[in-house]
């Protein structure tokens, strides 16, 4: 049975949608959340907050697996205020009948304080770090061209990173959070670059004849997988992040695309048409035989992304003229 999207991958859906943004203001973009109820959400009640901070908290928490209910149905009550230039917040556990978090935030702007409180709420209740202070990268159209932009994960504070006046696309973060890898037609050919967003320094990673696209940085930040066509058909290659030590992993006559790494860095998942249709495959990152990842009930799988715990792979598929996001166990199975 197809699963459109769960809370675990909600942010993935948001990022995929950003590439279609047209004509948005430089400091804010639209991010949509889709909830199909595949994962049981944590029921919480929120009170005391107003305006922008209330909207921020609801966005941050709904993306991370919370739903908002009446106080009588809530497992936790999140209460606080955002007056006087600061945010204060607390979490009451109805099962333990006591407060499990109570903090006041100062310094920075209100949005920063709000995201920080949301992170504290997530970690207090789930034990996992929140993602409220993370960034997203995306491409945005400027006339006929596309440029790379960076924004807060909720779409605010968007800033333009490239001004190549060409096609720039496929951004992928390095684990340090300071560097983006992407490809650009800056030199009239799709070449791969690394770009330090703090210093502005940009370096060429792959510039061969033909396509150099789809960079994906390894979890340890030392290697980058990519699609190169310098040997003929588009294949999966791996190199160091400084653009040395290139190694070809796939040698099929079919086109490969969209590499992504397993969280432990041992495997690379990608799309290949080796079987006639776009399907998911994986291959050892140090070289070896490629094997297919079955996606039962879905015959056309594209754009995979491995879950942080390594248990599942999210991917897109097109049905009836629309794209859906599906999830499959990383070993293959029903999608």
Language model features by range: what are they?
Residues 130-132, 175-176, 219-220, 263-264, ...:
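Residue-level detector of Asp-centered blade-edge/turn motifs that repeat once per structural unit
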Residues 141, 185, 229, 273, ...:
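Short loop/turn segments immediately following the C-termini of beta-strands
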Residues 22-59:
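A structural "domain/chain start" motif
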Residues 136, 180-181, 221-225, 265-268, ...:
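Hydrophobic beta-strand positions that form the internal "hydrophobic ladder"
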Residues 86-88, 144-149, 189-193, 233-237, ...:
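Structural motif
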Residues 152-167, 195-213, 239-257, 283-302, ...:
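Multi-bladed beta-propeller domains
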Residues 58, 73-120:
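Amphipathic beta-strand/beta-sheet edge segments enriched in Tyr/Trp
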């Amino acid at each position: 049975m197809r699963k459109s999207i769960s809370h675990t991958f909600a942010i993935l859906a948001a990022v995929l949608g950003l590439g279609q943004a047209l004509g948005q203001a430089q400091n804010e973009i639209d991010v949509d959340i889709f909830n199909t109820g595949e994962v049981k959400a944590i029921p919480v009640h929120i009170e005391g907050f107003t305006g922008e901070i209330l909207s921020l908290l609801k966005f941050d928490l709904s993306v991370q697996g919370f739903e908002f209910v009446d106080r009588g149905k809530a497992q936790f009550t999140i209460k606080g205020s955002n007056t006087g230039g600061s945010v204060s917040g607390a979490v009451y556990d109805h099962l333990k009948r006591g407060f499990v978090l109570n903090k006041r935030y100062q310094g920075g702007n209100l949005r920063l304080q709000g995201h920080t409180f949301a992170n504290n709420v997530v970690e207090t209740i789930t034990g996992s770090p929140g993602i409220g202070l993370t960034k997203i990268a995306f491409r945005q159209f400027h006339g006929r061209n596309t440029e790379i932009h960076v924004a807060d994960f909720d779409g605010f504070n968007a800033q333009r990173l490239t001004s190549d006046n060409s096609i720039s696309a496929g951004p992928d973060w390095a684990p340090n959070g300071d560097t983006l890898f992407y490809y650009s037609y800056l030199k009239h050919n799709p070449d791969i670059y690394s770009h330090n967003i703090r210093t502005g320094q940009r370096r060429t990673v792959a510039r061969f004849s033909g396509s150099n696209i789809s960079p994906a940085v390894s979890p340890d930040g030392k290697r980058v997988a990519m699609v190169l066509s310098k040997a003929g058909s588009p294949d999966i290659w791996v190199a160091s992040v400084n653009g040395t030590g290139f190694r070809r992993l796939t040698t099929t006559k079919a086109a490969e695309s969209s590499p992504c790494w397993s969280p432990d860095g041992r495997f690379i998942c990608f799309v290949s048409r080796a079987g006639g249709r776009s399907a998911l495959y994986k291959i050892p990152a140090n070289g070896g035989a490629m094997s297919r990842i079955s996606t039962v009930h879905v015959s056309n799988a594209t754009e995979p992304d491995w879950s942080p715990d390594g248990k599942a792979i999210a991917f897109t598929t097109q049905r009836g003229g629309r794209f859906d996001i599906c999830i499959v166990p990383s070993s293959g199975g029903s999608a």
